[in-house]
Design a protein with these regions (language model features):
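Single-stranded RNA-binding regions, centering on S1/OB-family and related RNA-binding modules
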Residues: 1-117, 122, 126-130, 136-149, ...
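N-terminal accessory interaction module
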Residues: 160-167
Length: 485
């Protein structure tokens, strides 16, 4: 047959009267009898495929293409199996005019049937239903489809497909969810139109707020601002599309300040824009690196974990964010590994850059690109990027640039400007103590991120007394260790 075949799919609620003799329909095998195979054309209509018209061996729930031979007066449908190459036809849904809903509006439609067009961003098989995480132009939610316990529903649906989902809007464990009655993959112009609509909305939502400007007067930061906005937008879009983020950073005080500022912004942004309240635990991971570059050991760990998550939990491959490392020629071997897996990589670093690595990066923030130098530290860059990701975190992280600056012994004028922002709250000596405490504690943490301990050192946990006692203890221990060397 030619390349212009149309295969019809009977939409939910459609009846026998909506079927046309001679047309080809997409169905699912319901069961078997001695005289033939029963084929479901939708949730209400089924037909009989006589054994003389069977061309291939099928199992229950398998998809099958059938042509309608005859619709009998009593409503029984006689079918004949046809075989077509996947690229030789387009599927067209037979349905009444569709009233589309948006995921963001589900909370106002609990108990009602909805139709959603969305991108599949995760597929997770549980011991019960299959959970499809879907993303439209308004948000991300889960759609639960059940065939039988532990059996994959809609096996034809893959990660990255555009789907039309029919089902009931429900609330489960205080989270919105769609109980799926039907789902099918959109192809061709239908899929393209949905992708364009979603992409246009995501581009607008991912754009950092226009009113966010650098905290201080700085020619270097002003010149870098457009690239910083670009990097922040990539991070925001990753969150909005349910793409995991791996943040790798140098395991010193400057790198920690850079990474924790972005971590603070991203975690809150995930909670503000996601469906699953626990998703910040698996969509973001911060990992310190011993070397000031992306080592083969580090990229191997990351690849191993992300590929396992992709297979086990149906997650997208992650965005790799490198901070206080990533700009040098020493990073090249790891970038070649990321290229094999077509990973998205972005960098915010203040080490002298090598232009040969730029071809591997979607965004590259480095003060050397605009006439600056290492005095504008990674912690300064990270704090400004964090504000672009989520401006609401600014009061929590306002002291990070000063801590990072004194940690790296910056002589840039930006350090004094950042210190002036926290005058009356933290002294320069207190910033030095936090920096030393971070370096000392990270030594014992090794490759662990020490999230809550680090937050206490940086006074992020609203426990100032514990912060003061912990920093004082770590500084004492660090100084004793230095004297013993």
């Amino acid at each position: 047959m030619g390349n212009t075949n149309t295969v019809y799919r009977l939409g939910p609620g459609r009846e026998v009267d909506d079927i046309v003799e001679g047309q080809i329909y997409l169905g699912n095998v319901q069961g078997f009898a001695t005289f033939g195979t029963f084929v479901l054309l939708n949730d209400r209509v089924k037909g009989l495929l006589h054994k003389s018209n069977v061309k291939s061996e099928k199992k229950e729930r398998d998809q099958i293409l059938v042509q309608v031979n005859q619709i009998r007066p009593n409503g029984n449908i006689d079918l004949r199996e046809v075989t077509l190459a996947e690229d030789s036809y387009e599927t067209q849904l037979v349905t009444k005019k569709i009233m589309l809903s948006r995921l963001a509006d589900l909370k106002n439609k609990i108990g009602r049937n909805v139709t959603i067009e969305a991108d599949v961003v995760q597929i997770k098989q549980t011991s019960g239903p299959t959970i499809f995480t879907i993303c439209d132009d308004s948000g991300v939610e889960d759609a639960a489809a059940f065939t039988e316990a532990g059996v994959r529903s809609y096996p034809e649906v893959n990660l990255g497909d555009v789907v039309r989902v029919f089902g009931e809007a429900t609330r489960r464990n205080n989270q919105m969810q769609i109980e799926v009655s039907d789902m099918h993959v959109l192809k061709g112009t239908e899929a393209d139109a949905v992708r364009v609509r979603i992409n246009k909305a995501l581009e607008a939502r991912a754009e950092p707020p226009e009113n966010v400007v650098p905290l201080i007067e700085s020619d270097v930061l002003s010149a870098l601002w457009s690239e910083m906005r670009k990097l922040a937008k990539i991070i925001r879009r990753a969150v909005l599309t349910h793409q995991p983020i791996i943040l790798r950073h140098h395991a010193d005080a400057d790198g920690i300040c850079a990474a924790v500022s972005v971590e603070t912004a991203v975690m809150q942004y995930i909670r503000d824009n996601g469906g699953d309240p626990d998703q910040d635990n698996y969509l973001f991971r911060r990992s310190p690196s011993k070397a000031p570059f992306y080592e083969i050991e580090d990229v191997t760990r990351d690849l191993d974990m992300m590929l396992k998550d992709n297979v086990r939990f149906g997650q997208k491959l992650p965005l790799i964010l490198l901070m206080d490392n990533g700009s040098t020629e020493e990073d090249m071997p790891s970038y070649k590994m990321t290229e094999v897996y077509q990973l998205d990589v972005v960098v915010a670093d203040h080490h002298h850059p090598d232009e040969t690595i730029d071809k591997y990066l979607l965004a590259h923030v480095n003060p050397y690109h605009v006439g600056g130098d290492f005095g504008v530290t990674a912690g300064m860059l990270g704090t400004e990027i964090a504000r672009l990701i989520n401006p609401a975190v600014e009061p929590k992280i306002l002291h990070f640039p000063a801590v990072a600056g004194v940690a790296d012994r910056s002589e840039a004028p930006e350090l004094d400007a950042y210190l002036s922002l926290i005058d009356g709250k933290y002294t320069k000596d207190e910033c030095k103590d936090m920096a030393l405490a971070l370096d000392y504690e990270q030594y014992w943490l090794r490759f662990n991120d020490g999230r809550e301990i680090v937050k206490d050192i940086l006074n992020l946990n609203n426990a100032p007394d514990r912060h003061n006692r912990l920093v004082a203890l770590l500084v004492t221990e660090a100084n004793a260790a230095i004297e013993d060397q």
